[in-house]
């Protein structure tokens, strides 16, 4: 997703990692909180991440 977002910017001079790192860290943090990403190793944005399990589709107890 991050690569697609940076590619979509189509900046001729490239993108600044310093400026984009804030948004990347925020996206990783929210992904871990929602469960779409799982942090496998490390702390913060320097760790390793993988995709989380998809939640069960619309199951309710009645």
UniProtKB/Swiss-Prot annotation:
It holds the Pfam family Linker_histone. It comes from the Eukaryota. One of its GO terms (cellular component) is nucleosome. The keyword DNA-binding applies. GO terms for molecular function: DNA binding. Histones H1 are necessary for the condensation of nucleosome chains into higher-order structures. Belongs to the histone H1/H5 family. This is Histone H1.2, embryonic. It comes from Parechinus angulosus.
């Amino acid at each position: 997703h991050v690569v697609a977002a940076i590619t979509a910017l189509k900046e001729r001079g490239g993108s600044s990692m310093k400026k984009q790192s804030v948004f990347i860290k925020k996206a990783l943090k929210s992904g871990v909180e929602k469960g779409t990403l799982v942090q496998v190793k490390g702390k913060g944005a320097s760790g390793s991440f993988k995709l989380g399990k998809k939640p069960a589709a619309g199951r309710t107890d009645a």
